[in-house]
């Protein structure tokens, strides 16, 4: 319990520091976002509304940065992320709420599948060295070295095109309304196949390689020799003794990968024009959309910290030495 309290206190401090940076960094970007907003909406927003917009977006010239910072925290504590410049007058929470399910559905599922399959293959490759799984490593390592966006472009060039089953862009067929029905769901799955395959191919090698190396290291430990001497089955020794201890570094890496689900596949979403949160972040940076950038960074920060806390809990469950310390 003391360990968890210490880690929780550390993560709370880290969250405060990250949110503080989240407030200041966008304000260091050159340019005036309010003027940019008026230019994009020329004819619909009066230039006389500049000061009102500055107050609305927390950029009041009559307030110093410290007052703006306190105002920002007040909004956060009330669950108010402000209004988006890019999608004005839509609230940031609405924009994020519309995009987050796409990213979690695509990247979350593919990350979990990649971890489970890669870890299982890594256990086999490390426990039975020289097997067919070992032969996969050079190919998977080569594919994982290719950048996400380049692999995505290759996938589009090879598998997408006129008359192809695989769409090259978008999250669903034009004209459909997002809903849980027999028209939208198959279309969404069809549009997610290529980006999901790109992420799987690029990320699986890391899990295989790290798990294989840990299995090789663990297999030479004394407790593995003792387990064999006790007459335990090969399967039980491999899974209950070797894999359980070799899994610890992968658990930490998996938690971090879950934390980076939101922003880690930005380029994949851009290449496939996928309506996820990474693509929204790209648009927000280009439009100097402070509130949307801050909202997305906040989601990324919280997801990373929560994922690390879950990794600490997993360590407590998997490694008795952590509980004793």
Named regions from a protein language model:
Residues 60-119:
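An internal, D/E-rich "acidic patch" concept
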Residues 6, 67, 71-75, 79, ...:
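Short hydrophobic helices that act as membrane-entry/anchoring signals
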Residues 2, 100-133, 148, 176-325:
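Alpha-helical transmembrane segments of integral membrane proteins
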